[in-house]
Amino acid sequence: MKKTHITEQNFADLGLQPQVIDGLNAKGFIKCTPIQAKALPVLLAGQDIAGQAQTGTGKTLAFLTATFNHLLTTPAPEGRKITQPRAIIMAPTRELAIQIFNDAESLIASTGLKAALAYGGERYEKQQQVIEQGVDILIGTTGRIIDFYKQGHIDFKMIQAVVLDEADRMFDLGFIKDIRFIFRRMPAPTERLNMLFSATLSYRVQELAFEHMQEPEHVVVEPEQKTGHRIKEELFYPSNDHKMALLQTLIEEEWPDRAIIFANTKHKCESVWGHLAADKHRVGLLTGDVPQKKRERILEEFTQGNVDILVATDVAARGLHIPQVTHVFNFDLPNEAEDYVHRIGRTGRAGASGNSISFACEEYAINLPAIEEYIEHSIPQSDYDASALLEDLPAPLRLQRRPQQNRRNNNGQRQGGNRKHTRPRQPRNTQS
């Protein structure tokens, strides 16, 4: 869990329970971020909120702190069984659910509360065993949570606090029926503390809040710039024939320490991965079809620096806390303007600078006007010299073949990946 820009509001001055303060202090959280400073006083007064905040603003810590404090100050319902959760936190993706759980585990020890994780792609029995040992806070994706409910392993009759994170993404992924199924089996909104967070408070998100919350107060924290002033943006107009060669040439020139490459489809991601893996880059692939255990391993390797480049669909663009990403490449311009902001927001975090390089190709250049209208500025354009693009590139690997990821031989010398230039490059001409 990162420490983002802060305010002068101290957690210790909010009237939180000592156990909660102890957990925050142990992790070095002393002062609030803007979303925490705005949301926590409202929540500690027992008022529901619908919060608008981007990923990376500290909203996870806000709703975890409020949830812990509410459960510590509110008696557990009489007759509650240990398998009946008192709070539920719903996330749109497995990766986000895991991240929330990890953040909760880092703070929860001093409270005496127990958290459990429920998401698809992981062994059902393993998660069930944890729940059967007792759960106060259930964190997970809606599908697996409903599976446990229908099998009789949990119910929602004793819920005292609810968090819906990335509500707009829930709509995008088609999970709203699941959310309503869960809400309708809980106590009435007046009998629980309700928290909704979303990158945008669109009409449909506000309608959901109206249906299942008790007069929520809207709390809005917007960045000064949608794309962040520390992110250097750059746009190229490659032909389809030049697109892959331009990407590989830019990787050679930029030499990114840690980069994420976004493409719009699973097939395109696999193609990009195949070209980079064949060129001996340490590259990982993150799409919806990658098995969950492998996804977790890839994210861990990327976070630890054992993988330099992650090729991903938008499944990785929101909710994940991946530190020190130096470059984001939009191999395809996203179809939704908001996704551009979420993608490039993976870099330039926690005061660091970052680089965003986007391709307006023949297929996706049509998305550019909507993106620039949304971010309220034009993306600076750069030209490239087609004759300077890499040509000596190996044939791409197929996904079923395991690429050689080791960059060092037995003598400790580096092999492949970010190869030295075989000839001088022509400098790029950047237009303001």
From Swiss-Prot:
<dbReference type="GO" id="GO:0005524">
    <property type="term" value="F:ATP binding"/>
</dbReference>
<feature type="region of interest" description="Disordered">
    <location>
        <begin position="396"/>
        <end position="432"/>
    </location>
</feature>
<keyword id="KW-0378">Hydrolase</keyword>
<dbReference type="GO" id="GO:0005829">
    <property type="term" value="C:cytosol"/>
</dbReference>
<dbReference type="GO" id="GO:0016887">
    <property type="term" value="F:ATP hydrolysis activity"/>
</dbReference>
<feature type="domain" description="Helicase ATP-binding">
    <location>
        <begin position="40"/>
        <end position="219"/>
    </location>
</feature>
<feature type="domain" description="Helicase C-terminal">
    <location>
        <begin position="245"/>
        <end position="390"/>
    </location>
</feature>
<dbReference type="GO" id="GO:0003724">
    <property type="term" value="F:RNA helicase activity"/>
</dbReference>
<comment type="similarity">
    <text>Belongs to the DEAD box helicase family. RhlB subfamily.</text>
</comment>
<dbReference type="InterPro" id="IPR027417">
    <property type="entry name" value="P-loop_NTPase"/>
</dbReference>
<keyword id="KW-0067">ATP-binding</keyword>
<dbReference type="InterPro" id="IPR023554">
    <property type="entry name" value="RNA_helicase_ATP-dep_RhlB"/>
</dbReference>
<dbReference type="InterPro" id="IPR001650">
    <property type="entry name" value="Helicase_C-like"/>
</dbReference>
<dbReference type="Pfam" id="PF00271">
    <property type="entry name" value="Helicase_C"/>
</dbReference>
<keyword id="KW-0694">RNA-binding</keyword>
<keyword id="KW-0963">Cytoplasm</keyword>
<dbReference type="GO" id="GO:0003723">
    <property type="term" value="F:RNA binding"/>
</dbReference>
<comment type="subunit">
    <text>Component of the RNA degradosome, which is a multiprotein complex involved in RNA processing and mRNA degradation.</text>
</comment>
<keyword id="KW-0347">Helicase</keyword>
<dbReference type="GO" id="GO:0006401">
    <property type="term" value="P:RNA catabolic process"/>
</dbReference>
<keyword id="KW-0547">Nucleotide-binding</keyword>
<dbReference type="InterPro" id="IPR050079">
    <property type="entry name" value="DEAD_box_RNA_helicase"/>
</dbReference>
<feature type="compositionally biased region" description="Basic residues">
    <location>
        <begin position="417"/>
        <end position="426"/>
    </location>
</feature>
<dbReference type="InterPro" id="IPR000629">
    <property type="entry name" value="RNA-helicase_DEAD-box_CS"/>
</dbReference>
<comment type="function">
    <text>DEAD-box RNA helicase involved in RNA degradation. Has RNA-dependent ATPase activity and unwinds double-stranded RNA.</text>
</comment>
<dbReference type="Pfam" id="PF00270">
    <property type="entry name" value="DEAD"/>
</dbReference>
<dbReference type="InterPro" id="IPR011545">
    <property type="entry name" value="DEAD/DEAH_box_helicase_dom"/>
</dbReference>
<dbReference type="InterPro" id="IPR014001">
    <property type="entry name" value="Helicase_ATP-bd"/>
</dbReference>
<protein>
    <recommendedName>
        <fullName>ATP-dependent RNA helicase RhlB</fullName>
        <ecNumber>3.6.4.13</ecNumber>
    </recommendedName>
</protein>
<feature type="short sequence motif" description="DEAD box">
    <location>
        <begin position="165"/>
        <end position="168"/>
    </location>
</feature>
<dbReference type="InterPro" id="IPR014014">
    <property type="entry name" value="RNA_helicase_DEAD_Q_motif"/>
</dbReference>
<feature type="binding site">
    <location>
        <begin position="53"/>
        <end position="60"/>
    </location>
    <ligand>
        <name>ATP</name>
    </ligand>
</feature>
<feature type="short sequence motif" description="Q motif">
    <location>
        <begin position="9"/>
        <end position="37"/>
    </location>
</feature>
